[in-house]
Amino acid sequence: MNVFSYLLDPAHWTGPQGIPMRLAEHVYYTALTLLFALVIAVPIGAWIGHTGRGGFLVVGLANGLRALPTLGLLVLIVGATGLGLIGPITALVILAVPPILAGTYAGLRNVDPAVVDAARGMGMRGREVLLGVELPNALPLIISGIRSSVLQVISTATIAAYVALGGLGRFIIDGLAVRDFPQMIAGSLLVAMLAVAADLLLAGLQKLVVSPGLRAAPGPRRLRVVPSKTPDAAHAA
């Protein structure tokens, strides 16, 4: 049986071990990981980027976490927590945080200081500047970090199969156990296709949420103030 025969076999598209179920499990692991990573990385990156304090920590932390071997980290966490979802998700979150953290920090630090000064001159307070000016103008780099994180998580979520969980990694691990190479290659192709589909989806989302001016003219010198209808701003105007 070759790879295409394996993928086209109706028996592999039904049941709890079929391709749709494994795909849904893989997407679930990825979405759960991304949710935790966003909750952790975006506020920290935004605060550091806004205040300018601790930037060296972002660089050091991002590089340090990226250097950790995910599989080795998974073994350590599973040894402490036991089998289950906690180990793989924790390992994947540690992998997913650095790109988002670095993208958020870099995005805010690249906002033109003149734009921020203009916003403050309009009477906007610190939080209003962060939410109404800096974060919207930092979206291109933030979303780029998210895209990088998602690709890494999708490709690495196959480690969940090492601790008896599901996902597309089951095709690779189970195929390796019985030397079923078509199954292993099919699993790898499915992971790659999912990664490409997710990246295209996020690219489309980026076009929707990022203003055309920021897409056409990236760079701090062309960033703009996002209009804000705050009472202080209206009064200052």
Segments the model singles out, each with a brief description of its role:
Residues 1-34:
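Periplasmic/extracellular loop-to-transmembrane helix junction in inner-membrane transport proteins
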Residues 44-77, 92, 102-110, 117:
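Cytoplasmic-entry segments and transmembrane alpha-helices of multi-pass inner-membrane transporters
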Residues 31, 94, 127-159, 182, ...:
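Transmembrane alpha-helices
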Residues 39-44, 87-116, 139, 146-157, ...:
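Membrane-embedded alpha-helices of multi-pass transport/permease systems
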Residues 21-30, 78-99, 139, 183, ...:
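Loop-to-helix entry region at the N-terminal start of transmembrane alpha-helices
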Residues 103-142, 168:
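Short cytoplasmic-facing helical segments at TM-TM junctions of multi-pass membrane proteins
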Residues 79, 156-185, 189-191, 210, ...:
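Glycine-rich helix-loop "coupling/hinge" segments at transmembrane-helix boundaries
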Residues 52, 109, 113, 186-237:
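C-terminal transmembrane helix and the adjacent membrane-cytosol boundary/short C-terminal tail
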